[in-house]
């Protein structure tokens, strides 16, 4: 299935996964950008944003678990997020953490909060519609991860 066919499939888990990839880039960029703040609270939230981005890399790009040397404990933690509902919950929690960052004042971290919330909504819609989780082949869903090993 090509990328265009994946988007035409109307499976919300595909939309969630690609929104998650954008979240990875945004969380890493905003985490780094806001870490150079003079506000201690904002620095803490920027570190949390960076950690969220790093976790999302392994959740949304499954073949990285096979090629990166990680511990079995970390692998088991990441493998918990294989259903739409678990991913929706994870994204909602990450989004809530970034929304709380507003206590330190307005910052770019709100963009991460909004996009994480959108990804959570996509995964929740997939769960509500009882759609099976389908990983994008482009990101190592069905096929690429098996070819590597």
Swiss-Prot record:
It comes from the Eukaryota. The chain crosses the membrane at residues 12-32, 39-59, 81-98, 104-124. Keywords: Glycoprotein, Golgi apparatus, Membrane, Transmembrane, Transmembrane helix. One of its GO terms (biological process) is vesicle-mediated transport. GO terms for cellular component: Golgi membrane. The keyword Repeat does not apply. Pfam families: Cg6151-P (PF10233). Golgi membrane protein involved in vesicular trafficking. The gene is tvp18. Glycans are attached at residue 11. InterPro entries: TVP18/Ca-channel_flower (IPR019365). The keyword Transmembrane helix applies. Belongs to the TVP18 family. It is a multi-pass membrane protein. It is found in: Golgi apparatus membrane. This is Golgi apparatus membrane protein tvp18.
